[in-house]
């Protein structure tokens, strides 16, 4: 172990951002009109040797918001049936789901001494656009742990 890795933390490795891998499943491409149906978040942590490892995953099955568009082709692609009784038994409303996820991420973020989370994903701005629309719909801006526009995108 070098002196560099001994003092390296996830906070100073990523400029005080905690990387969180995010994946969403949606009912279309428009974050303002189409439902966000599922979200999963996995914080990326770092051990004392400077190796990255996944933190505990947190996820939610989300009930479509009132008036949400459910594109048939998107549902066929994802295989999600938002009207399935089994899914309805575990699905949460948007506000409950996102605030539960943010509460967990806040705890992890604070334990790593990071100031914000940064969304990591494949085509990350797509996921972030749905997350930001959900934040706006649920008036959860003050609870959000994510940077509003910066991402780490695995496509690029």
Question: Positions of the model-derived regions?
Answer:
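Substrate-recognition/cap helix-loop segment adjacent to the acidic, metal-dependent catalytic center
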Residues: 109, 126-149
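Conserved non-catalytic scaffold segment of RNase H-like nuclease domains
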Residues: 2-125
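Short alpha-helix plus adjacent loop in nuclease-associated cores
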Residues: 151-156
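Residue-level recognition of the N-termini of beta-strands and the immediately preceding loop/turn
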Residues: 115-118, 146-150
């Amino acid at each position: 172990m070098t002196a560099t890795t001994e003092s390296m933390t996830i906070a100073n490795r990523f400029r005080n951002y905690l990387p969180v891998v995010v994946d969403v499943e949606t009912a279309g491409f428009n974050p303002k009109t189409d439902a966000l149906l599922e979200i999963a978040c996995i914080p990326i942590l770092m051990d004392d040797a400077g190796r990255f490892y996944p933190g505990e995953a947190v996820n939610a099955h989300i009930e479509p918001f009132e008036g949400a568009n459910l594109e048939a082709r998107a549902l066929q692609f994802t295989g999600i049936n938002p009207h399935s009784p089994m899914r309805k038994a575990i699905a949460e409303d948007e506000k409950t789901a996102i605030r539960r996820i943010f509460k967990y991420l806040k705890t992890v973020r604070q334990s790593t001494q990071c100031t914000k989370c940064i969304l990591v994903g494949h085509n990350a701005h797509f996921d972030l656009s749905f997350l930001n629309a959900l934040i706006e719909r649920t008036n959860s801006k003050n609870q959000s742990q994510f940077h509003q526009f910066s991402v780490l995108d695995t496509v690029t």
